[in-house]
Amino acid sequence: MRKLGIDYGDSRVGLAISDELGITAQGLETVHHNGNDKLVLKRLEEILAQYEIDTFIIGMPINMDGSRTERVQVTQNFIHKLRCKFPKIPVETIDERLTTVAAHKTMNYLNIHKDKKKEIVDTISAVYILETYMNKQKNQK
């Protein structure tokens, strides 16, 4: 079974998927939704038809001092929709602090053109979210 990492944003959602053993994460895609969560849920339904996903991992936007951002409530609203649409698939959250910073550093290191960065930053962030979750799970064993 695989895990699906989700970087939820106002207009784009980055998606990453684990391998079946839960060892590696790879970027899947960025879904452009412009506030229409139905588009995201429909795409997730298609992904679930293609892959055996056993857990959704969503990045929670926490401030550096540990306080909650205003985006936390928006993300929690999406999580509620996700749980209603896919009640059999558990949703886990993970602190996503610095994932976007790490994604930008990765893209700079790889010399990715600035026009392309906007298209893939959310997917790369989703990879970091998923990797963070999987590493945490590994360390708890």
Cite the ranges covered by each PLM segment.
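Phosphate- and other anionic-substrate recognition elements at nucleic-acid/protein interfaces
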Residues: 2-3, 11-141
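Conserved catalytic-loop position in the HRD/HxD motif
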Residues: 7
